[in-house]
Curated annotation (Swiss-Prot):
This is Protein TIS11. SMART domains: ZnF_C3H1. GO terms for biological process: 3'-UTR-mediated mRNA destabilization; negative regulation of gene expression; positive regulation of nuclear-transcribed mRNA catabolic process, deadenylation-dependent decay; regulatory ncRNA-mediated post-transcriptional gene silencing. It comes from Drosophila melanogaster (Fruit fly). A zinc finger (C3H1-type) spans 135-163, 173-201. Induction: The zygotic transcript but not the maternal transcript is moderately induced by forskolin and tetradecanoyl phorbol acetate. Residues 205-250 have a biased composition (Low complexity). It comes from the Eukaryota.
Length: 436
């Protein structure tokens, strides 16, 4: 719209049109114009002009638009308009209800959280959150150490005392090098959890922990090796004891037979002294006697010594009554085997190490492996026999294991078993001397 007043006059029925912007004024002038006052008309025209000037100023201040916006109106039925209004009102009513529900659920959730914090025992973790087992029970529980109680109880992931504290699997180089940050700046952000050494106390503590760990590992290894070595030895000793008992019974029962005498004359019996020595382990180095032990299942204490002495005594009495017949009795105990002929009562004492010829040992068993720590003990074979005739030939064999080292042969005390044997042999020797 232009700012000027457009005045159009059209002579038609003596009428004039005045157009000004959006405001129009129709003035009719006819022959009865004399009835109206001209001054009032002029005043109205001036007011209209002033109003138009104000409108022009307002249009100049606002952004100028050359064309007005094109708008189209589409008529809709009144029912659709009412339905839309009702739906809009329902949505507005539902929105506050949903908001109130959300606030209620949030409040309930906060209440549950507060209840969980107030409980003395925590609930079990859901299966979706796995527990970190690498740090489980590796640190002491501070509330338990300070107050003596913990609200989590047995489900606490920290140790309630030193007995529950577990060792952490550290890197081999843990706490073996100095912390560059601590020694250059004087501060380390990791603090006591740093993997490097901050002072000498930490290094000493780490060395002590490593030494204790290595000692426990060595002890466990030695126990395992000793248990492994003990199982085959016990089995072999039981087999040897059963074999020796059967041989002693068979030889003692056939004392009066001539065939057994001829077969046993001039023969030597080699019986194994002890179970084969295994390769040296930690347990072998610690014990001065090698594989010998005083356990009730070992072969050293499971042989009948008194039965052997009784068989020898009966054989000597048989020699007095019948000098032409010979009998052989063999008894094995603690790896000791002996064969006796007629009239050789003194041979028993010599065979047990108490005779005139001194101690003697049989040759080495072929089952004994060579050990780098315990070398095979020396063995000597002494065969002594005196004939009461051409058919009486006595052969004996003394089995005795030497001490693990030559230097300990004189210092090591004798076992109680040998003391009992020596006392029994002395009594038997005195009886045989009196009988002869």
């Amino acid at each position: 719209m232009s700012a000027d007043i457009l005045q159009k006059s059209r002579e038609q029925d003596d009428s004039h049109y005045f157009e000004r912007g959006d405001i129009s004024k129709y003035v009719t002038m006819n022959d009865h114009l004399g009835d109206f006052d001209c001054n009032e008309v002029r005043k109205e025209i001036r007011m209209l002009l002033a109003h138009g000037a104000n409108l022009d100023q307002q249009h100049q201040q606002q952004p100028h638009r050359h064309h007005g916006g094109l708008t189209r109106t589409i008529s809709q039925p009144a029912q659709l308009i009412q339905q839309q209004q009702q739906q809009h009102q329902q949505q507005q009513q539902q929105q506050p209800a949903v908001a109130s529900l959300v606030t209620i659920t949030e409040n309930l959730g906060n209440m549950n959280l507060h209840r969980k914090l107030e409980r003395t025992q925590s609930e079990p973790l859901p299966p979706q959150q796995p527990m970190n087992t690498s740090r489980y029970k590796t640190e002491l529980c501070r509330p338990f150490e300070e107050a003596g109680e913990c609200k989590y109880g047995e489900k606490c992931q920290f140790a309630h005392g030193s007995h529950e504290l577990r060792n952490v699997h550290r890197h081999p180089k843990y706490k073996t090098e100095y912390c560059r940050t601590f020694h250059s700046v004087g501060f380390c952000p990791y603090g006591p959890r740093c993997h490097f050494v901050h002072n000498a106390d930490e290094a000493r503590a780490q060395q002590a922990a490593q030494a204790a760990k290595s000692s426990t590992q060595s002890q466990s290894q030695s126990q395992q090796s000793s248990s492994q070595n003990f199982s085959p030895k016990s089995n072999q000793s039981s087999n040897q004891s059963s074999n020796s008992s059967s041989s002693s019974s068979s030889s003692g029962g056939g004392g009066g037979g001539g065939n057994s005498i001829n077969n046993n004359n001039g023969s030597q019996f080699y019986l194994p002294l002890s179970p084969p020595l295994s390769m040296s382990t930690g347990s072998d180095r610690e014990s001065p006697t090698g594989s010998l032990s005083l356990s009730p299942t070992n072969s050293l204490t499971s042989f009948p010594f008194h039965d052997a002495l009784q068989h020898g005594y009966l054989a000597s009495n048989g020699a007095k009554s019948n000098s032409s017949a010979s009998s052989t009795s063999s008894a094995s105990g603690m790896g000791l085997g002996m064969s006796m002929g007629i009239g050789q009562g003194m041979i028993i004492g010599q065979g047990l190490g108490m005779g005139h010829h001194g101690p003697a040992t049989p040759p080495e068993s072929p089952n004994v492996p060579i050990s780098p720590v315990h070398t095979p003990p020396p063995y000597d074979v002494v065969v002594s026999g005196s004939g009461a005739g051409n058919n009486s030939v006595g052969s004996k064999q003394l089995l005795q294991k030497s001490v693990s080292t030559p230097m300990q042969q004189e210092d090591t005390p004798r076992l109680p078993v040998f003391n009992r044997l020596s006392s029994g042999v002395e009594a038997y020797q005195q009886q045989s001397n009196l009988g002869l």
